[in-house]
Amino acid sequence: EILRCLVGSEMCIRDSYISVYGKNVLDSEIMAKIAKNLTELIGHTPLMELAEYSRKYGLKRNIVAKLESFNPAGSVKDRVAFAMIEDAEARGALNPGATIIEPTSGNTGVGLAMVATIKGYHLILTMPETMSVERRNLLKALGAEIVLTDGLAGMAGSIAKAKELRDAIPGAVILQQFENPSNAKAHEHTTGEEIWTDTDGKVTVFVAGVGTGGTVCGVARALKKHNPDVYVVAVEPASSPVLEGGEDAPHRIQGLSLIHI
Protein backbone atom coordinates (compact mmCIF):
# COMPACT_ATOMS: atom_id res chain seq x y z
CA GLU A 1 0.00 0.00 0.00
CA ILE A 2 2.88 2.35 0.80
CA LEU A 3 4.41 1.64 -2.61
CA ARG A 4 1.17 2.43 -4.41
CA CYS A 5 0.73 5.65 -2.46
CA LEU A 6 4.25 6.71 -3.39
CA VAL A 7 3.79 5.89 -7.06
CA GLY A 8 0.47 7.68 -7.28
CA SER A 9 1.29 10.66 -5.13
CA GLU A 10 1.83 14.29 -6.03
CA MET A 11 3.51 16.75 -3.73
CA CYS A 12 1.19 19.45 -2.40
CA ILE A 13 2.15 22.61 -0.54
CA ARG A 14 -0.66 24.61 1.05
CA ASP A 15 1.00 27.87 1.98
CA SER A 16 2.02 30.59 -0.45
CA TYR A 17 5.42 30.83 1.14
CA ILE A 18 7.74 28.18 2.53
CA SER A 19 10.33 28.77 5.20
CA VAL A 20 13.75 27.41 4.26
CA TYR A 21 16.50 27.88 6.83
CA GLY A 22 14.56 30.79 8.28
CA LYS A 23 14.03 32.54 4.94
CA ASN A 24 10.65 32.87 3.23
CA VAL A 25 10.75 32.03 -0.47
CA LEU A 26 8.06 31.67 -3.12
CA ASP A 27 6.83 28.12 -3.62
CA SER A 28 7.59 28.40 -7.35
CA GLU A 29 11.28 28.72 -6.54
CA ILE A 30 11.16 25.52 -4.50
CA MET A 31 8.75 23.57 -6.69
CA ALA A 32 10.99 24.01 -9.73
CA LYS A 33 13.42 21.63 -8.03
CA ILE A 34 10.86 19.13 -6.72
CA ALA A 35 9.71 16.19 -8.84
CA LYS A 36 5.94 15.93 -9.32
CA ASN A 37 6.01 12.16 -9.85
CA LEU A 38 8.51 9.33 -10.03
CA THR A 39 8.90 9.38 -13.81
CA GLU A 40 10.75 12.69 -13.47
CA LEU A 41 13.39 10.88 -11.43
CA ILE A 42 14.21 8.32 -14.14
CA GLY A 43 17.74 8.60 -15.48
CA HIS A 44 20.69 10.82 -14.64
CA THR A 45 21.99 8.04 -12.44
CA PRO A 46 25.43 8.52 -10.86
CA LEU A 47 28.76 7.10 -11.90
CA MET A 48 31.10 5.57 -9.34
CA GLU A 49 34.75 4.73 -9.84
CA LEU A 50 35.63 1.18 -8.77
CA ALA A 51 39.01 2.26 -7.43
CA GLU A 52 39.50 -0.70 -5.11
CA TYR A 53 38.89 -3.13 -7.96
CA SER A 54 41.48 -1.38 -10.10
CA ARG A 55 44.01 -1.45 -7.27
CA LYS A 56 43.35 -5.11 -6.52
CA TYR A 57 44.07 -6.22 -10.08
CA GLY A 58 46.74 -3.64 -10.86
CA LEU A 59 44.75 -2.04 -13.66
CA LYS A 60 46.12 1.04 -15.38
CA ARG A 61 42.72 2.35 -16.40
CA ASN A 62 39.83 3.72 -14.38
CA ILE A 63 36.77 1.47 -14.20
CA VAL A 64 33.49 3.30 -13.63
CA ALA A 65 30.07 1.77 -12.90
CA LYS A 66 26.78 3.45 -13.76
CA LEU A 67 24.44 2.87 -10.82
CA GLU A 68 21.11 2.19 -12.51
CA SER A 69 19.70 0.98 -9.20
CA PHE A 70 19.22 4.69 -8.44
CA ASN A 71 16.26 4.76 -10.82
CA PRO A 72 12.97 5.01 -8.87
CA ALA A 73 11.88 1.40 -9.45
CA GLY A 74 15.41 0.16 -9.00
CA SER A 75 16.78 -0.78 -12.41
CA VAL A 76 17.83 0.29 -15.89
CA LYS A 77 14.46 -0.98 -17.15
CA ASP A 78 12.71 2.12 -15.80
CA ARG A 79 14.10 3.96 -18.81
CA VAL A 80 12.73 1.38 -21.24
CA ALA A 81 9.30 1.20 -19.60
CA PHE A 82 8.87 4.97 -19.68
CA ALA A 83 10.13 5.28 -23.26
CA MET A 84 7.88 2.53 -24.62
CA ILE A 85 4.77 3.98 -23.01
CA GLU A 86 5.60 7.54 -24.10
CA ASP A 87 6.19 6.32 -27.66
CA ALA A 88 2.90 4.38 -27.74
CA GLU A 89 1.09 7.51 -26.54
CA ALA A 90 2.76 9.68 -29.18
CA ARG A 91 1.81 7.23 -31.95
CA GLY A 92 -1.80 7.15 -30.78
CA ALA A 93 -1.54 3.43 -30.07
CA LEU A 94 -2.28 3.88 -26.38
CA ASN A 95 -5.42 5.70 -25.32
CA PRO A 96 -6.13 7.09 -21.81
CA GLY A 97 -7.13 4.37 -19.37
CA ALA A 98 -6.22 1.57 -21.79
CA THR A 99 -4.78 -1.81 -20.86
CA ILE A 100 -1.09 -2.53 -21.34
CA ILE A 101 -0.05 -6.17 -21.56
CA GLU A 102 3.52 -7.41 -21.39
CA PRO A 103 5.05 -10.87 -21.10
CA THR A 104 7.87 -10.37 -18.60
CA SER A 105 9.16 -11.82 -15.38
CA GLY A 106 11.94 -9.31 -14.88
CA ASN A 107 12.63 -5.69 -14.09
CA THR A 108 10.79 -4.45 -17.17
CA GLY A 109 7.59 -5.49 -15.42
CA VAL A 110 8.53 -3.52 -12.33
CA GLY A 111 9.26 -0.42 -14.39
CA LEU A 112 6.06 -0.78 -16.39
CA ALA A 113 4.02 -1.23 -13.21
CA MET A 114 5.37 2.02 -11.82
CA VAL A 115 4.88 4.06 -15.00
CA ALA A 116 1.46 2.56 -15.82
CA THR A 117 0.13 3.36 -12.35
CA ILE A 118 1.37 6.94 -12.56
CA LYS A 119 -0.18 7.42 -15.99
CA GLY A 120 -3.46 5.70 -15.15
CA TYR A 121 -3.18 2.56 -17.28
CA HIS A 122 -4.24 -0.96 -16.35
CA LEU A 123 -1.24 -3.27 -16.60
CA ILE A 124 -1.42 -7.03 -17.08
CA LEU A 125 1.83 -8.97 -16.84
CA THR A 126 1.98 -12.56 -18.05
CA MET A 127 4.72 -14.75 -16.60
CA PRO A 128 5.52 -18.40 -15.90
CA GLU A 129 4.10 -19.79 -12.68
CA THR A 130 7.66 -20.60 -11.61
CA MET A 131 8.35 -16.95 -10.83
CA SER A 132 8.90 -16.22 -7.14
CA VAL A 133 6.09 -15.16 -4.84
CA GLU A 134 8.20 -12.16 -3.81
CA ARG A 135 8.37 -10.91 -7.40
CA ARG A 136 4.63 -11.37 -7.86
CA ASN A 137 3.86 -9.51 -4.64
CA LEU A 138 6.09 -6.59 -5.62
CA LEU A 139 4.38 -6.23 -8.98
CA LYS A 140 0.94 -6.42 -7.38
CA ALA A 141 1.95 -3.77 -4.84
CA LEU A 142 2.83 -1.49 -7.74
CA GLY A 143 -0.63 -1.99 -9.23
CA ALA A 144 -0.09 -4.71 -11.84
CA GLU A 145 -2.41 -7.64 -12.50
CA ILE A 146 -0.53 -10.93 -12.75
CA VAL A 147 -1.54 -13.76 -15.08
CA LEU A 148 0.47 -16.93 -14.54
CA THR A 149 1.17 -19.39 -17.36
CA ASP A 150 2.41 -22.98 -17.47
CA GLY A 151 5.95 -23.07 -16.15
CA LEU A 152 6.93 -25.82 -18.57
CA ALA A 153 6.05 -23.55 -21.50
CA GLY A 154 8.49 -20.90 -20.30
CA MET A 155 8.33 -17.36 -21.67
CA ALA A 156 6.93 -18.67 -24.96
CA GLY A 157 3.77 -19.60 -23.07
CA SER A 158 3.63 -16.17 -21.46
CA ILE A 159 4.01 -14.46 -24.84
CA ALA A 160 1.21 -16.56 -26.31
CA LYS A 161 -1.05 -15.70 -23.37
CA ALA A 162 -0.28 -12.00 -23.74
CA LYS A 163 -1.37 -12.10 -27.39
CA GLU A 164 -4.53 -13.98 -26.43
CA LEU A 165 -5.41 -11.31 -23.85
CA ARG A 166 -4.65 -8.49 -26.28
CA ASP A 167 -7.06 -9.95 -28.82
CA ALA A 168 -9.76 -10.31 -26.15
CA ILE A 169 -9.46 -6.86 -24.52
CA PRO A 170 -10.57 -3.85 -26.63
CA GLY A 171 -7.83 -1.25 -27.02
CA ALA A 172 -5.19 -3.36 -25.28
CA VAL A 173 -1.57 -2.94 -26.34
CA ILE A 174 1.47 -5.20 -26.08
CA LEU A 175 4.62 -3.08 -25.93
CA GLN A 176 6.98 -6.06 -26.50
CA GLN A 177 10.40 -4.95 -25.30
CA PHE A 178 12.20 -7.52 -27.48
CA GLU A 179 10.89 -5.93 -30.69
CA ASN A 180 10.21 -2.32 -29.67
CA PRO A 181 12.67 0.23 -31.15
CA SER A 182 12.06 2.48 -28.13
CA ASN A 183 14.06 0.00 -26.05
CA ALA A 184 17.39 0.84 -27.68
CA LYS A 185 16.41 4.46 -28.36
CA ALA A 186 15.85 5.05 -24.65
CA HIS A 187 19.50 4.20 -24.01
CA GLU A 188 20.75 6.02 -27.08
CA HIS A 189 19.07 9.26 -26.04
CA THR A 190 19.59 9.05 -22.28
CA THR A 191 21.99 6.44 -20.87
CA GLY A 192 24.64 6.83 -23.56
CA GLU A 193 24.54 10.61 -23.53
CA GLU A 194 24.76 10.65 -19.74
CA ILE A 195 27.84 8.44 -19.81
CA TRP A 196 29.52 10.64 -22.41
CA THR A 197 28.74 13.84 -20.54
CA ASP A 198 29.58 12.58 -17.05
CA THR A 199 32.96 11.20 -18.19
CA ASP A 200 33.73 14.45 -20.04
CA GLY A 201 33.97 12.41 -23.22
CA LYS A 202 36.83 10.31 -21.88
CA VAL A 203 35.07 6.93 -22.00
CA THR A 204 37.00 4.50 -24.20
CA VAL A 205 35.32 1.15 -23.46
CA PHE A 206 31.68 0.32 -22.65
CA VAL A 207 30.68 -3.07 -21.21
CA ALA A 208 27.12 -4.33 -20.73
CA GLY A 209 25.31 -7.62 -20.34
CA VAL A 210 22.95 -8.61 -23.14
CA GLY A 211 19.36 -9.64 -22.56
CA THR A 212 17.12 -7.86 -25.06
CA GLY A 213 20.19 -6.02 -26.37
CA GLY A 214 18.60 -2.61 -25.82
CA THR A 215 21.20 -1.26 -23.41
CA VAL A 216 24.33 -2.29 -25.27
CA CYS A 217 22.98 -1.29 -28.71
CA GLY A 218 21.53 2.03 -27.62
CA VAL A 219 24.52 3.14 -25.58
CA ALA A 220 26.90 2.01 -28.33
CA ARG A 221 25.09 4.16 -30.89
CA ALA A 222 25.28 7.22 -28.65
CA LEU A 223 28.94 6.83 -27.74
CA LYS A 224 30.08 6.03 -31.27
CA LYS A 225 28.37 9.16 -32.58
CA HIS A 226 30.77 11.11 -30.40
CA ASN A 227 33.77 8.84 -30.86
CA PRO A 228 33.68 5.97 -33.39
CA ASP A 229 36.69 4.40 -31.66
CA VAL A 230 34.82 3.62 -28.43
CA TYR A 231 35.13 -0.14 -27.90
CA VAL A 232 31.88 -1.93 -26.98
CA VAL A 233 31.79 -5.28 -25.17
CA ALA A 234 28.59 -7.36 -25.07
CA VAL A 235 28.58 -9.87 -22.20
CA GLU A 236 26.74 -13.19 -22.26
CA PRO A 237 27.00 -16.35 -20.14
CA ALA A 238 29.89 -18.62 -21.14
CA SER A 239 27.53 -21.60 -21.04
CA SER A 240 25.06 -19.91 -23.42
CA PRO A 241 27.16 -18.17 -26.14
CA VAL A 242 24.28 -17.23 -28.44
CA LEU A 243 25.91 -14.08 -29.85
CA GLU A 244 28.94 -16.10 -30.91
CA GLY A 245 26.75 -18.56 -32.78
CA GLY A 246 26.61 -21.15 -30.04
CA GLU A 247 23.63 -22.93 -28.55
CA ASP A 248 21.32 -21.46 -25.94
CA ALA A 249 21.76 -23.38 -22.70
CA PRO A 250 20.72 -23.07 -19.04
CA HIS A 251 22.66 -20.64 -16.86
CA ARG A 252 22.20 -18.80 -13.57
CA ILE A 253 22.47 -15.18 -14.69
CA GLN A 254 18.96 -13.74 -14.73
CA GLY A 255 18.11 -11.44 -17.63
CA LEU A 256 20.98 -12.42 -19.94
CA SER A 257 21.02 -14.47 -23.14
CA LEU A 258 17.26 -14.41 -23.67
CA ILE A 259 17.43 -16.14 -27.14
CA HIS A 260 15.12 -13.51 -28.73
CA ILE A 261 17.98 -12.52 -31.03
Per-segment meaning from a language model:
Residues I30-I259:
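PLP-dependent amino-acid enzyme catalytic core
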Residues V7, V25, V80-F82:
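Sequence-pattern detector for short linear motifs
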Residues E1-D15, I259-H260:
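Single conserved hydrophobic/aromatic residue that forms the stacking wall/gate
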Residues I2-C5, V25, G58:
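Acidic/proline-rich low-complexity IDRs
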Residues S9-E10, R14-I30:
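Short, Lys/Arg-enriched N-terminal segments with co-localized hydrophobic residues
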